[in-house]
Structures are given as structure tokens and as C-alpha cells.
Amino acid sequence: MSNSNIDNDPAKIDSLLKKAKSKKIPVTYDDINKALPLNKNPSIRQLEEAILKFSDAGVDILESNEDDEIKLDIGMDEEFKLSTNVDNESEDEVEEENIGSTDDPVRLYLKDMGGVDLLTRENEVEIAKRIEEGRKTMTASLCRSPIAMRCFIVWYEDLVNEKMLLRDLIDLEANMLHDEVHENDEEHNSETEVEEHEDNHLSMSRVETQILHNIIDRMKKISFICEELLIEAKKCYEESFEPKVLQNSKKYNNNLELLINEVSEIHFNSKRTEEILGKMYGINRDLINKETAFLKLAEKYGVTRQNFLDEYIGSVINAAWKEKMLKNKKVAWKELITKESDYIDQMINELSVIESNTGLLVNDFKKLVNTIQKSERQTLQAKKDMIEANLRLVISIAKKYANRGLQFLDLIQEGNIGLMKAVDKFEYRRGYKFSTYATWWIRQAITRAIADQARTIRIPVHMIETINKILRTSRQMLNELGYEPTATEIANRLSMPLDKVRKVMKIAKEPISLENPVGDDSDGGQLGDFIEDKNAVAPIDAAIQSNLREVTTRVLATLTPREERVLRMRFGIGMNTDHTLEEVGQQFKVTRERIRQIESKALRKLQHPIRSKKLNSFRNGGKRGDGNPSDLLEA
């Protein structure tokens, strides 16, 4: 069957969509591919727009399944069958088509992305609550750890003593941009965003100055609470060593609640959180290694794994536990404790050191780490769900920034980074949809990347901002004046030094590749072919010099060998340099005067019309204009 009527039929996608919606059945990626032009591979833009069209309409897009034979009765061509069996094609052709469809990374990305359902407003709120719950649990758990308390105290001291920058402690971007995201038209001019984006970036330092004192005051309060908690915890463990005593302490619980509330109000830098988690996870790994080694040792003495866990888990491993296990009814335990007494004593000491470093009993510390890890997994999974459901939004925004200096995949990657930031900072209680909030962050990430990476010669972002400001002013003045403004006029309008304006306008010029084609024809050549090489010898000059050498050689050959040799040495003809009368005299073992006489005689011979007329054309050509025949020989 001919495909000529299908290739250019713009209604095929709409017809497929209409039938799928009316019959409430899904489509596959093969169906979409078949509905696109078949005379050539569909472009990324066509495929992406088709997938977004079906997704926005609520039609499910399924993976291709060779066992399914679901068909749509649309009364048109067989091309709309959802069956993956392709008629009238050889197996080799089918295999080549499948390979081609999975080779393109963009197509693979779009295919995987299309398999994730879009979120409703309720779904977004539900996921946001999961993220919030995970964060609350993690914050509360971290605040219960003396390790975190000590970190808070150190951070405050470093901040006050100017050993740490504020941006290294908190997420400045979240504090600065939190109130700047408003509902705006998605068709906002993307070029204007690129120009205005840097103003926000440059204000980061101003925001740091503005909120520094507020953060210092808050960290001072956190540091004071942590010191109170550490003192009370130390006192409790020294006196009773019973966790329940501390848990029942009203003062301790009140201070702990205050600490959790204060820490929750600060958006700490992710590196700071990772610093605390890294310390706790490192100690936990050390504990697991020690327990694993102890378990293997116990199994050698016949202690079963389950019995070991029953006796070990939940117990405080100390001298009292050792005495208790000596009285155990199981012979294996008695043998283990008796023969490995030194090993167990060493382990008890090591666990005691860990308890001292963590400020918690080993069992309490392990429970705390498990709670943190569980909340971290919960938060990461919720973020993953939110990100995957909004990948289409990134593509729809990235399309608007095509041909701006970055490839489409790079735009998607940068947009995805912005999407992840949006997920981290989204607050569902403000009432706006996540897509509205995320759009700003995605655009911000893409425009930042374009400003930072698009140019062949990288220019700092602050200079990009100045360039955009001058270009924007230049366009405004062009509309007002009717002609291109001069650098002086722009400098006066912006109250900027003239030298700086000229420098910026010079920097603003985009470099051009020497391999750019010239003309519409394939034989037009490249731009580099038309650039003058000032060091290269012109072809006509090279031809003249070559001819001059040949004529000079023939003319000198009419002299005696001695005269020819003297002239060549004196004027450097065919040699690297010329020679003095004394140097030539030493060569011929005669005096300087004799060489001068030979030279004069040879030059008089060259002035004879028979010889000189052969050289006159070179002299008249203006290469050597003083008329001296000897000058003509210097070539």
C-alpha cells in the first residue's frame, strides 16, 4: 500500500487522538510513529509535540507489546493499527526500524517520560505532604543527635568569627527567591528573561548582607539551646545512664522542641546537612562492621544467627551483659565469652568510645540513624515522583530557548536541574500549582546556563548582565532616535564611562567560525578561505622572485667563475648572508683591495646593455627603485 497519501496528511494525529479518546483506549509509541510522516524520520520536535498532545488529552501511551493485537476501527488505512505486526515488510526492515527508533537518546528519553502519568492538583499536594513529612522527621531526628548539636555550635562560632560565609551555611537562593516566584504568563518573552536574570543573581550578595544579622541571632539562639541540651544529657547519662530519665525530663523536651522549631525555620545549605549525615552514617557503618565481625565469631562457636540477634539486639553491651551471657544456658555462649574474653572486652571499650562520641547509647543511636535513613528514602522517593511527572514541563519550556547557543539535550538537562530545585523549595500551602512555581525555576536554570555556557569564549555572568543592559538600551534608543546610537550616546543614557561602554560593545561581538560556509552553493568555500594572510607571499610576488632568481643566475653565468663567486658572496646571492671585503679576501687569499677591484669590474660588465636589459624589467617594476644594478642582484 502506498504511503504517499499518509505522509503529508496533517489530520492523522488528530484522527488517532479522537478515536483513542472516544473509545477510551490507550495508544502505543509505534502508533504515534506511524502517524508521523513515513517518507523520512520524524523530527524530535514532531515526536515530542505528538506525545505531549496525547498526554495533555489524557490518553495513556503504552510501550509496544508484540503480543497485543488491539486495533482502532477508524475507517482509514491499516497504518493506524495498534498491532506491532508490520505487514509487507521483511524482518530485516523491521529490525532496522526498531534499532533506529531506540538509537536516538532524545527519543528514548521522551519514550520513558511519556510512561509517567501527569499529576492532578490533589496528587501534587499529596506528594508535597510526603516530602514535608519526611523533612520534618529528618529534622526532628537530627536535632535529637548530640553530633548535630555540636555542629550547630561550631557553625555559629565560625559564622561570628567570619570563618564561614553565610552562603556556605544556608541556602541563600531559597531565602532570596522564595518570594519572587509569582504566577505569570507562560508566554513571557524568553529573551527578556535572559537579559534580566542576572539582576537577580547579582543581588545575592545584597541579600546575604541584609539577612546576615538575622541569621546570626537565630544561630545564637540555636547554639544556646544546644549547649543546654548537651549539658542536661551529659548530666543524665553520668548519673543514671538511663535514656528514660532524659526522655521524661520536661526541661529537656521543651528545649528540644524549641530547637526543632528554630532549625526548621532555617534553610540550611545541603552541604551542611550532608556534613551531619556523613558523620552519623560513618559511625553507623563502623558499628555495623563491628557487629558483623562479632556475629561471624559467634557463629564459629555454634551460636545461631537468630539466637545472636535475640541476645544482642536491644541489649546494652557492657560488663554486666558479659556476666549475664556467662550464665546463659547455651553452652555455645559460655564458650564464646570464656575463650574470647579479651576480644569482647575490647569491643565493649570501642562501643563505649562510640557512645561517648555520639552522646547516645549504641541502641538509641542506631534507632536514630534508621529513622533518619527511612525519612530520607521517603523524601527522595516523593521528590522522584514529583520530578518524573513534570519532565514534560521542562521540554515545553526548553523548546522556547532553542538556537540560543545550547543543544536541546543540554537545555533539557539544565531545565531538569531547575525542576529539582523547584521540588526542593515548593510550598503547597501558598495555593499555586506546582507547574506555576516550577516554571520560574526551570527558566531561571536554563537562562543561567545560556548566559554561562552558550558563548565559545566564556564571559562572566556579571559582564553578560552589563552587555544585555547596553544592548537593551541601544534598541530603545534606536526606536526613539531612528538611527543606531553611538557609544557616547549610550554612555550618557546609562551614566556609564565611555571606555567601559566601548569595551563591553567590543566584547559583545560573537565569534564566528572560520569553517562557516560562504554562499548557498556547496562549492562556495569557507569563511577562512577569504581572510587575508598578511604573512603569506602574494602569488605574483612569488612568481616575480622566482623569475628574478632564474634571470640573475643566467646573467651571472656570463661572468668569469671568480667574478660570479665574488658577487654572490658580497651581495649574498644564493647564500644566507652577504660577506665583507675582508671575509671574501680570506676566502680567495687576496687583499681587500683586490676583491674591491674584482667587484667593480664585475658590476661594470653587468651594466653592459646585453646583460642589463635582461634585468631592467625587474628594476622598472618598482621592487628596487634606486637604479643600482647591484640591488637587482639581492634576490
From Swiss-Prot:
Lineage: superkingdom: Bacteria
| Gene3D superfamilies the UniProt entry points to | RNA Polymerase Primary Sigma Factor, Sigma-70 factor, region 1.1, Winged helix-like DNA-binding domain superfamily/Winged helix DNA-binding domain
Q: What is this protein called?
A: RNA polymerase sigma factor RpoD
- Tell me, in one coarse class, where this protein mainly resides: cytoplasm
Q: What is the lineage of its organism?
A: Bacteria, Pseudomonadati, Pseudomonadota, Alphaproteobacteria, Rickettsiales
Q: Where is this region: Disordered?
A: 182-202, 610-635
The organism encoding this protein is Rickettsia prowazekii (strain Madrid E)
The residue ranges marked as DNA-binding region are: 581-600
Q: Where is the composition biased (Basic and acidic residues)?
A: 182-191
- Mind telling me which PROSITE patterns this protein's record contains? SIGMA70_1, SIGMA70_2
Among the GO molecular function terms of this UniProt record, one is: DNA binding
- Where does the protein end up? Cytoplasm
